[in-house]
Every structure is written in structure tokens, then in C-alpha cells.
Regions:
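PRPP-associated nucleotide enzymes
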Residues: 1-199
Length: 199
């Protein structure tokens, strides 16, 4: 379905690639993968990268609580013993390029991250620069035993040597396409769509 004019006057086509049931299934699969890779749920902490990564971390925490009894405290969401957020704004490499971003709050889970397996949670993995900023931000907070990355969508086009450990959907895209995730908590619905012709 057409979505009108892009900023450069190019017609943009929009294609839906994931809807609510697909996103739910992807998060359930990621939760099982995380538990399998960690041999259970002990010493695991989720840190969502705001904005939508934080929402996904909360959802993932609830899914883990459904599967793993020791994750029941994660039902409390951000700030619980197992789920937090990690603001990467001041660690981004595009700060001096006129791209304005409002800082978010970093919320470390009550149990901290030292000696834990930290799973960074983000919505869309693209260039890898946000994840690099997250790794930098993590250094100032503590010393986890290991850091893993879970993303809902990996769209390719990496500019840095970064790879996700857990991916909900690999979505090959062209460089002039934009992948957008809407979540009910922030946008009113659960959808992943591709806008074509957006640079």
C-alpha cells in the first residue's frame, strides 16, 4: 500500500512483513534460545536499548517467566531483578553530526550486572553502531561474565563486525529501504514493515 511522499519527493511503498502473532512467536523462540544457550535462567539479565528494545526486553522477560520458574520476578518489568534498560545516547558516534536524540534513563536490574550474562535487546540490527554504543555504555556500569545480543529483526548492511546471537527474523533489505517496528506499548499496534525508496 502506498504511504505517500518521502522527504525527497520519492514515492514510498510500504510492505508489512511481521504482525502481532509473528512477533509473539519470534520472542518465544528467542526466549527458548537464550535459555538453551545459558543452560537455564540463572545469572541472566536483560537490558533493553530504548525505546523499542526496552519494550521488547520487558516482553521477553514475561516470556522467560512463563518458561522458567526462577524468572517470575521479571513479570514486574523494567527495574525488576532481571530486566533493565541501557541508554546509549552519549556513546553514539553520530552525536556531532547534527542528529539530535533525547537521552533515556538507564535502569540497572536490582541484582546488578557483575558476573551475570547480560543479553542486550534491540529492535532492528542494521549497521551495528547502536550495539557498539551499548557495549561502550556497559563498560561504565559493571563487568558482566558475558554479553549477548538479541534482536527482533536483523536487516543486514553491517558497518561494524557485530552479529546477533538471537534473531527473531532475518530480513534481507536494500540499502534504500527502512525497516520500522511498531509496538502496541509505543505505537498502538504490533507490526514490522519495510518502506521502500527511503534513504
Amino acid at each position: 500500500m502506498p504511504s505517500g511522499e518521502a522527504g525527497k519527493g520519492v514515492d514510498v511503498g510500504t510492505r508489512t512483513v511481521l504482525q502481532q502473532p509473528d512477533i509473539t512467536r519470534a520472542l518465544t523462540r528467542i526466549a527458548h534460545e537464550i535459555l538453551e544457550a545459558n543452560h537455564g535462567g540463572s545469572d541472566l539479565v536483560l537490558l533493553g536499548i530504548p525505546t523499542r528494545g526496552a519494550v521488547l526486553a520487558e516482553r521477553l522477560g514475561r516470556v522467560l517467566a512463563d518458561i522458567e520458574p526462577e524468572w517470575q520476578s521479571a513479570r514486574a518489568g523494567i527495574g525488576s531483578e532481571r530486566v533493565g534498560t541501557l541508554d546509549v545516547t552519549m556513546h553514539r558516534d553520530d552525536l556531532g553530526h547534527g542528529i539530535g536524540r533525547a537521552p533515556h534513563r538507564t535502569v540497572i536490574p536490582a541484582g546488578g550486572i557483575d558476573g551475570k550474562v547480560v543479553v542486550l535487546v534491540d529492535d532492528v540490527l542494521y549497521s551495528g553502531r547502536t550495539v557498539r554504543a551499548a557495549l561502550d555504555a556497559l563498560q561504565g556500569i559493571g563487568r558482566p561474565r558475558a554479553v549477548r545480543l538479541a534482536v527482533l529483526v536483523d536487516r543486514g548492511h553491517r558497518e561494524l563486525p557485530i552479529r546477533a546471537d538471537h534473531v527473531g527474523k532475518n530480513l534481507p533489505t536494500a540499502s534504500d529501504e527502512r525497516v520500522t517496528l511498531h509496538l502496541s506499548e509505543t505505537d498502538g499496534d504490533d507490526t514490522v514493515f519495510i518502506e521502500q525508496g527511503v534513504a
